[in-house]
Amino acid sequence: MSKKIQAIRGMSDLLPKDSAFWLSLERTIFDLFISYGYQNIRTPIVEKTDTFCRAIGGATDIVEKEMYSWIESGGESLSLNPEGTAGCVRMMIEHNLPREGIQKVFYQGAMFRRERPQKGRYRQFHQVGLEVFGATNAKVDAELMMITHTLWQVLGLKNIVLEINTLGSSETRVAYRKILIAYFNQYKDQLDENSLKRLKTNPLRILDSKNKAMRSLINNAPKLMDYLDKESAQHFEQFKTYLDALNVTYIINTCLVRGLDYYNRTVFEWTTTNLGAQGTICAGGRYDGLVEKMGGIPTPAVGLAIGLERLILLLEVQNLMAIEPTLSIYLVALGEKAQIKSMQIASTLHDALPNVILYNDLTLGSFKSQLKKANKIKAYFALILGEQELNNNQVSIKPLKGQGTQQTMDLEEAIKYLKENK
């Protein structure tokens, strides 16, 4: 017997029993984004590896360890998307979109990282993201928080907290980097192996360490907030003022630095304690220098990404997985003539009831077996087309959820009945 083919570990299939909720959730998210004036974009899942090296930073864990990369026959290195912002920025530059004024866009798609699979962390995962190009003030940062806060309310989520921080300007971080190196050099014997490496490459990432043994050392480290340039300090104060006006509760986390090199000023995470170590549901920040760094005109920008798998895990934990029921009908056809007629009726019903799910039987089975399938898929009504119905140019409607008794009527009356009983 041949060995059964299986999916790659950490890359899961989405089965029909789960996809209805995914579609419903994505529709809710996209409708909300569109209502705030964001437009959808689609970028390739593969980019030149250099795109990510320049954007994310060569010393980050993503570039060093986690990307799926390969060399093309011509010698060029390509990579699967590990995140969405770099490809979005590349697209903006390539099509000269920043020259057209403020751009508000959203994207969705699969991302790929070579990680150790565990609950809430996968090798293929899905994100939806918002990006705004061309606006430098804190108002747009606050708008992103307002949108996500509204989304949590629409979904009914509880126990989700907004953590914010500021990383200041690039000049501020250069000066602070030296201060941080001097501090941690005094305690090198207390640093773990990963932090010793970061001390040489990106000392700010030490602040993000999950090593509990280093927590006291990190908490006592100099705070970037104390070394902010005037403009960044004002920007952060404006950001907080907007959040207060919107009644969006937040906590300031001075150790929040994010794992990508392109961030400056505002950074944020929406977190929950319901998912253990993988508690970040949404994260992002400002990246005012990235467009220029990647070859475009100087363009301020800010964005966020929501991890769909983690969001769905949280909805599941909080028992919020129910979706609004949609009227569904199973079309039962008995006999060869009825099969042909059922196709015509199905076409008419789709036109008259566009939001109704219609299952046209494909088994050509007995009345009993077709009705059994109708009950299995939890249809609300069976629309029956047998010999008697054919001869009288009628259909029979059988309620399957106790909504009444079976009735026979012409198709026009049936459509009216179904509209009234949605």
UniProtKB/Swiss-Prot annotation:
Alphabetical UniProt keywords: Aminoacyl-tRNA synthetase, ATP-binding, Cytoplasm, Ligase, Nucleotide-binding, Protein biosynthesis
InterPro entries for the chain: aa-tRNA-synth_II (IPR006195), aa-tRNA-synth_II/BPL/LPL (IPR045864), Anticodon-bd (IPR004154), Anticodon-bd_dom_sf (IPR036621), His-tRNA-ligase (IPR015807), HisRS-like_core (IPR041715), HisRS/HisZ (IPR004516)
Keyword Transferase listed: no
Domain of life of the native organism: Bacteria
Biological processes, Gene Ontology terms: histidyl-tRNA aminoacylation
Location of the protein in the cell: Cytoplasm
Chemical reaction(s) catalysed: tRNA(His) + L-histidine + ATP = L-histidyl-tRNA(His) + AMP + diphosphate + H(+)
GO molecular function: ATP binding; histidine-tRNA ligase activity
Major localisation: cytoplasm
ATP-binding as UniProt keyword: yes
Similarity-based family: Belongs to the class-II aminoacyl-tRNA synthetase family.
NCBIfam families with a match to the protein in the record: hisS (TIGR00442)
Subunit structure of this chain's protein: Homodimer.
Name of the featured protein: Histidine--tRNA ligase
Taxonomic source organism: Ruthia magnifica subsp. Calyptogena magnifica
Gene name for this UniProt entry: hisS
